[in-house]
């Protein structure tokens, strides 16, 4: 009974080898050589995308400022004044039997009620978009936790928000895979691999379809104004589709907020990756010599649409990326180039026939 307890063994993690320190051989410098030493230049690397992602996630949090409180207080006071004045007008119209004024008060009450209802609905949808960021933080904590009891309820809530029925095959596989001895990290990890991947696959198909449409539209069209309007319309529809797929109902202001956050994310972290992904393929295959200028512009527009969809997918997704399952531009680049080449070959072969 006096033997010490053995340390805990986690079979899900790889074995850790004890580091062995390697010593270099001694090197002696003369006094003349030491005078020629120069300080080593430090390579200042730019911030990685994790800093940009954190900045965008922080932008999703509600910000409480003094000016905002003053504006909200003024609007509340103005609304109370309008309601009080409307009640007084209604009482005066009823006492004087002024039916025209009474009808106007009723119409005004209906309009105000509709406006208040729309504002409440927009606020609820915007609050739901902000809550998704808190859910990602909670999921990140559960993925690093060894506690028991919270993971199953959290995953069931996510499935209900996404509109996944209890009889869905992916959800049934998840129920069959979990048991009482698993902790929250394992339960959430199983949900991410069995259920969340189904939604991610649907989002990838939507991104591929919208990116291909943008590529082909820019490649065959010669009107810049029409191209800009088409790309803007398709990008907004892509954001709506991805948000609906992940169980988020966007209103007017929440849609604008999500679109702004996606563009902010692209401006932070997208330029370097876009140049790297596109340049790697263009320099290797010399596409500039094989395709026309319009086709090259179409590929660029399609890649930007794909980048927009990836970032919208990341902001609407309830779970953080794990096991390098985040989609990359390279996943869509080859598909776009193949579809564009196939379309150009068909267009060249049709006049010959």
Swiss-Prot record:
It is found in: Cell inner membrane. Residues 1-35 are annotated as: Disordered. Its main location: membrane. The chain crosses the membrane at residues 70-90, 100-120, 213-233. Keywords: Cell inner membrane, Cell membrane, Membrane, Transmembrane, Transmembrane helix. The keyword Transcription does not apply. Residues 1-19 have a biased composition (Basic and acidic residues). Coiled coil: none annotated. The keyword rRNA processing does not apply. GO terms for cellular component: plasma membrane. It is a multi-pass membrane protein. Pfam families: DUF697. It comes from the Bacteria. Belongs to the UPF0283 family. This is UPF0283 membrane protein YcjF. It comes from Salmonella gallinarum (strain 287/91 / NCTC 13346).
